[in-house]
């Protein structure tokens, strides 16, 4: 049976063109008729004749799924104009004419059709919410995809990224910035650094820079920082982490510990930078902020910039959009396991275990992903042998700006401490919004990965676009009994997707630093969320004077730009500012 599955995968791959992704800077829109869909992406010259495999693929789709021929074949006579590309030829060769489309979903039939078509064509689903789904694919595949979808979806989509190679090219650090790094070096200061001085967060950093930076922090702040190793990767690299806290001597009680992890999916660079930013902010503010000092005296914080160093390095050196780790699978040309689908709790790999080419491939068995297994063993050893009590787990991802709590595998049953999970999640969302005005939606993880029929007043959920069993979120919550476990999807909402510009690194880091402060104050029991120390420059949003409205421009009820003091929270009406202030909180529809 396994051999038959592999042969089936090989046959389908032989009939499919390589699938890449969508970037865009064009202002085109799809025509109303689905047969004209491909003309959305204009060209400077007539298209070259279709290759043998592309024509074979189109023929297979036409025959098996009865797709009209005009939807499966490019029209070589079509002419248009293409913008000039500055991306290197190597990027153009790898990503070709890949695009990212956003489909608006309205009912269960549309979701099911989109999920089935994505599986048939081996498409890369970038993100999904209860309103839309972003899919990366080659322009050659667009007609085939539309032909597999109902008519309602053939016209309810827009292009998000038209030119993936160019967008990828612009996401890498510029040569001028790299030269400035070589001259100035990375020197954390005991005083709060300006953006110009703290150049580490002016751009994304490769793994070869992150590790020495972590060592430097450890040597400079040895009183409250240690560098530890979580385990080893498939390719033999260490998985480094920073342990931050003030360890009391001869304390028999278990040490309460918060884990913040990023980079499980290699292409989500903003999660790596954000973990580093939050760690750096706690480290450098220990001697300046009494609230930070209190937290580090009560809790240990473990910051893991990337659980997937092999994959992260691969995104820098080979494929910027790579998602999985780099371990071998049963198919030599389809390496990698999805490190957020391979955990042991409610692992549902029986559905996708025979397809190593899937972006969500969970491996052949629970904990088949080496890095996830190493992480779980480290966590168990900490609780069993090192007097550690894990009280919170935050798993940073991108994108879509969502705060998700358990469970991911299913919306039934509810987690036992649902109300507390929701309360803290709302507080985190509020802290984020009051930092830089960004809105994060709060929901259970199962709802965040499917569409809901709230708009049509039904309690029945839509089918899922992606399988969600075997997540780190559920494992930490259920198997390790970490009561406050969250998965946070960072910026943005799809304009750039995984290729978020470097200008978002510091603002996103500020938002998550304040989120961690709220988490810590909540766990400390300081009157709910406790006060945020807005006197610390690291917690205040850095807005230009032109961005701050004058008094006559401010609505007396609009405090979104003003640093929020949680000490005054009890003076407000209970619940004020949550649902009424449109913070994106969606309560569970079924209790």
From Swiss-Prot:
GO terms for molecular function: zinc ion binding. SMART domains: Zn_pept (SM00631). Keywords: Cell wall biogenesis/degradation, Disulfide bond, Glycoprotein, Metal-binding, Secreted, Signal, Vacuole, Zinc. Zn(2+) binds at residues 265, 268, 397. Residues 533-591 are annotated as: Disordered. Belongs to the peptidase M14 family. This is Inactive metallocarboxypeptidase ECM14.
């Amino acid at each position: 049976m396994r051999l038959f599955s592999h042969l089936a995968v090989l046959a389908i791959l032989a009939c499919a063109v390589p699938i890449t992704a969508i970037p865009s800077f064009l202002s085109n829109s799809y025509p109303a008729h689905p047969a004209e869909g491909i003309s959305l992406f204009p060209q400077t010259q007539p298209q070259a004749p279709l290759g043998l495999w592309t024509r074979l693929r189109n023929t297979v789709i036409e025959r098996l799924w009865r797709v009209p021929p005009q939807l499966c074949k490019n029209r070589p006579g079509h002419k248009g104009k293409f913008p000039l590309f500055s991306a290197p030829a190597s990027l153009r060769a790898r990503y070709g004419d890949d695009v990212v489309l956003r489909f608006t979903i309205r009912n269960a039939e549309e979701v099911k059709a989109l999920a089935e078509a994505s599986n048939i064509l081996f498409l890369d689903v970038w993100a999904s919410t209860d309103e839309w789904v972003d899919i990366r694919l080659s322009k050659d595949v667009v007609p085939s995809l539309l032909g597999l979808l109902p008519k309602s979806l053939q016209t309810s989509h827009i292009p998000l990224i038209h030119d993936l190679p160019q967008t990828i090219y612009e996401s890498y650090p510029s040569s001028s910035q790299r030269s400035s790094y070589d001259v100035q070096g990375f020197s954390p200061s005991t005083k709060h650094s300006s953006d110009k001085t703290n150049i580490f967060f002016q751009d994304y950093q490769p793994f070869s820079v992150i590790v020495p930076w972590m060592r430097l922090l450890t040597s400079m702040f040895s009183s409250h920082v240690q560098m530890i190793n979580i385990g080893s990767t498939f390719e033999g690299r260490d998985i480094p982490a920073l342990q931050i806290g003030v360890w009391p001597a001869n304390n028999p009680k278990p040490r309460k510990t918060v884990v913040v992890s990023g980079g499980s999916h290699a292409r989500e660079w903003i999660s790596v930078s954000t973990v580093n930013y939050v760690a750096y902010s706690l480290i450098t503010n220990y001697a300046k902020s009494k609230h930070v000092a209190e937290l580090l005296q009560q809790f240990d914080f473990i910051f893991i910039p990337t659980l997937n160093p092999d994959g992260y390095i691969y995104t820098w050196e080979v494929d910027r959009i790579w998602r999985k780790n780099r371990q071998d699978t049963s198919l030599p040309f389809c390496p990698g396991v999805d490190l957020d689908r391979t955990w042991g709790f409610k692992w549902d790999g029986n559905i996708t275990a025979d397809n190593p080419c899937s972006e969500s491939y969970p491996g052949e068995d629970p904990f088949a992903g080496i890095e996830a297994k190493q992480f779980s063993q480290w966590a168990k050893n900490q609780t069993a042998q090192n007097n550690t009590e894990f009280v919170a787990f935050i798993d940073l991802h991108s994108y879509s700006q969502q705060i998700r709590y358990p469970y991911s595998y299913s919306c039934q049953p509810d987690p036992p401490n649902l109300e507390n999970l929701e309360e803290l999640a709302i507080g985190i969302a509020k802290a984020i919004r009051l930092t830089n005005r960004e809105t994060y939606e709060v929901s259970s993880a199962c709802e965040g990965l499917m569409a809901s029929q709230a708009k049509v007043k039904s309690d029945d959920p839509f089918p899922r676009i992606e399988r969600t069993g075997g997540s780190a979120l559920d494992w930490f919550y259920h198997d390790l009994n970490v009561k406050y476990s969250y998965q946070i999807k960072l910026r943005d909402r799809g304009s750039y997707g995984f290729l978020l510009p470097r200008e978002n690194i510091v603002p996103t880091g500020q938002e998550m630093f304040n989120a961690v402060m709220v988490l810590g104050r909540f766990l400390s029991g300081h009157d709910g969320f406790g006060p945020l120390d807005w006197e610390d420059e690291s917690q205040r949003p850095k807005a230009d004077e032109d961005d701050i409205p004058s008094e006559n421009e401010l609505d007396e009820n609009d405090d979104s730009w003003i640093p929020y003091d949680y000490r005054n929270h009890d003076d407000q009406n209970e619940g004020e500012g949550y649902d009424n202030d449109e913070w994106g909180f969606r309560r569970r529809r079924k209790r």
